[in-house]
Amino acid sequence: MTSYDLILAAAAGAVCLAISVALWSHGQRRNLEARIVALKTRLIQQGGSDDAPAWLDAFDTAVIAVEGGRANLVAGGEGLIACAKALGADAEVSAVVAALSDADPNYAQKLTALFERGEPCVFEARGPHGLVSVEGRAAGALAWLRLAPIDRADSGLPTAARFAAFVDSVVEPCWIAGADGQAIWGNAAFVRAVGAASAQAPALAGKSFDRGADAVVVEAAGKGERREALRWINVEGRRRAFRLSAQPLDGGGVGVFCADVTEIEDVRDAFKKHVEAHDETLNHIAEAVAIFSQTRRLSYHNTAFAELWGLEPAWLADRPTHGEVLDRLRQRRRLPETIDYAGWKAAELARYEDLGPQADDLWDLPDGRTLKVVRQPHPLGGMLLIYSDITGELRLKAQYNALIQVQQATLDKLNDAVAVFGSDGRLRLHNEAFETFWNVTPHALEAAGDFEGVVELCVPRLHDLSFWRELKGRVADPDPQMRAPTSGEVRTSDSRIVLYQSRPLPDGATLIAFADVTDTRDLQSALADRSAALAEAERLKRDFVGNVSYELRTPLTTIIGYSELLERADGISERGRNHVAAVRAAATQLARSIDDVLDMAQIDAGEMALEIEDIRVSDLLLNAQERALKDAQLGGVTLAVECEEDVGLIRGDGKRLAQTLDHLVENALRQTPPGGRVTLSARRALGEVRLDVSDTGRGVPFHVQAHIFDRFVGRDRGGPGLGLALVKALVELHGGWVALESEPGNGSTFTCHLPETQQPGAMQPELGF
C-alpha cells in the first residue's frame, strides 16, 4: 500500500467516524422530536405552559416550539436559564431567540430559514458568557429549537454540531447512502454538487452524485466490504477525477468519501504521455536502444534493437535478462569473438555496479560489422545501452583518407608554389612550382629536410628574416592562434610581389603556398589610378553642372518674377500680355529643366534620399490632374483620372512620385493633338501598385522605344530631354521600374510599377541579381 493510499484510508476513516456520529445524532433528534410533539400535546391539553408538570423544567436542554412568530418553551426551564445566561439575555423565550439572532448575522439567516421555510440547522452560538448548542428542525406546522449550554470544561469535546460542521468543512463530497445507493444525508460539498436544497433525505430524493458511484455503493452494501473506484465526474461544469471510497456502516447504510485526485491523474496522464512520447521517439531513431531494469531484465527496446540483432519480438516481450540476451546472441555468433566468454560476460554485467560515466566500446562482429556501444546508468535504475552500426562510417573514413591523398597529389600540379611541413617541421610535400619559384633543385630540398634547411635555400631571393621567423611559428608552434590561417604579401629581392598563404591541415601539418602576383598588382594599380581619374572627372562634371545650374537659376527667378508682375500690370495690351506670358512660361520651363538636371546629377552621385510616407494613390492622381489641367485645356485635350477604389495607400516619397507623374503627363499632353484624351489610372496587382499614364496621341516609333528613357533623347520641342530619364531614375529609387506600351498612330501608355511597401534608398539592381 502506497503512502497515498494510507493517507486516503485515514481520511476516509475520520470522515466515516464523523458520518457515524452524525447519523447517531440524526436518530437522536428524530426521537426527541417525537417526544416534543407528545409533550406539546399534553401541554395544550393542560391549558398552557403555566400548568405544565414541574419535571419539564428539569431538563438541561431547552426545547422551544415556534409557530406564527410566537415562541413557547416546551421543556427545559433550567436549560433556558443557562442558555440565557451564556447569551447575556433575559430568561425569557422570546429574549433568548432574539439574542440568538443578534449574536451573528449567520445565526439570524439560519433561524429565518428554519421559521419560514422549515430548513433544518445545527450550529453553536457564541455569547458574551459562553457557548450554546443550537439545533433546529421543522415538524408539521411547528419549528422546534433545541438549546443546550456547553460547559467550558467540555467546550473542546466533539459534539454533534461540531461533527456536522467538520464534515461540512470537507471540500470533497461525503454522504451516507442506503443499500439502494440513494443518498439519505450529505455534507455541504455533496449538497452543492447534486444541487439539493438541504442535506436531509427528503431533499436528496432522486439526487445522485454519479450513477457509477451509486453502483459502487450498492456493491459495498451488498457484499458488506469496503469498495474503491476512480470516477471522472462533471462538477460545476468541469470534469474532475475522484477516488471513491464506500464503507458499510454499523447499523445500516454506507458512508461514502470522495477525494479529488484530478491533479494527480493529470500528472499521471502527462507522465504516461511523456513516457510514450519518449518511447516513440526512441523507436524512430536508427540506433538500437535497450533499457535494462535494476533486476537486469529488459524493460524497453526499440524496433532497431530487434532488427539489429535479429531477435524475435515475442521472445523480447517476455523480458529476458541481460545475461540471457548475451547468451542468445553468442549462440547466433553475433557477439565479438573472445576466448573467455564467461569472463567477458561477467565483466559486461559488472557494469551495473559502476554508476559513473562509462567509456564507449567498439565491437567487431564475425559478420564484418563494427558496432559502437554506448552505456550509461538509467535515471530510474538499471542501464541504457545504445548500439550504433558504424561500419559504413569507417568505410567512408577510409575513402576520405584516400581522397585526401588524391587531393594532395592534385596540389602537386598547381601553378602556385606549394609546400607541406609536418608539426615537427619536416618537409613532407612540395610541387614542381615550388622548385621553380625559389630556383632550387629537388635534390637540394631533399637534403634540406626541415623548415630551417628550406629557409636557407630561399633566403637569397627573400632576405626578410622576420618573415621567415613568423612563418616558422605557423609551422611549429602548437598554439591554436599561431596555427590560424594567415595570408599576406612580401617583396622579393628581384622586385617580385609574392602572395603567401598559410593553412593548417587536419593531421597537424601546415600548408604554405606562394604565388607571384606582380602583374596582377600592377594591373590593379593602373585600374585604381584610372578609376580615381574617372571619379575626379565625374566630380568636376557634377560640380560644373551644379554651379552652372545655380548660376542660371538666379536670372531665371528674376525673369519669372518680373514676368508675373507685367502680366498683372495695367495698361499693357493683350498682345503684350501674351508675349509676357510666353516669356514666363519659357523661363519656368527652363527652371524646371535645370531642376531636372540637378536631380539627375544628385541621383548619379547617390545623394538623393527618399522621404518615405503613406500616400493615398487617388490623391496623387487627382493632384497631378489639377496641376496639368490648365495646360490640357489650352491644348484642347481631355485629362481624366480613373482609380480603383481598393488601391488605397502606397509607401513612397510623395514629392518625387508627384514629379514623376508631372513629367509623364507633360509628355502625354505634348504627344496628344487637340481633341485627344490623356488618362491617369492606378490599380493594385501582384504585390505592387501600377500607375498608368496613357494618351491617344501619335505614339512612339518602334526604333525610338528602345531608347525612350535614355538621357537627352531629342523632343519635338526643345529641352534637354531629361524628363523620361528622370522618371525612370525616380521610380527605380522606389524599387520599381517603368514600362512603355505604344504602337505608332494608336497612342502610348507609360506604366510605373511600384512595390506596395518601400524602404528609403531602395533601388532595383540593373541586372536583376
Curated annotation (Swiss-Prot):
PROSITE patterns: HIS_KIN (PS50109). GO terms for cellular component: plasma membrane. Autophosphorylated. GO terms for molecular function: ATP binding; phosphorelay sensor kinase activity. The chain crosses the membrane at residues 6-26. It catalyses: ATP + protein L-histidine = ADP + protein N-phospho-L-histidine. Residues 547-758 form the Histidine kinase domain. It holds the Pfam family HATPase_c. InterPro entries: HATPase_C_sf, His_kinase_dom, HisK_dim/P_dom, HisK_dim/P_sf, PAS-like_dom_sf, Sensor_HK_Regulatory, Sig_transdc_His_kin-like_C. It is a single-pass membrane protein. The keyword Transferase applies. Keywords: ATP-binding, Cell membrane, Kinase, Membrane, Nucleotide-binding, Phosphoprotein, Transferase, Transmembrane, Transmembrane helix, Two-component regulatory system. The modification Phosphotyrosine is found at Y550. It comes from the Bacteria. Its EC number is 2.7.13.3. It is found in: Cell membrane. Required for cell division and growth. It catalyzes the phosphorylation of CtrA and activates transcription in vitro of the cell cycle-regulated fliF promoter. This is Sensor protein DivL.
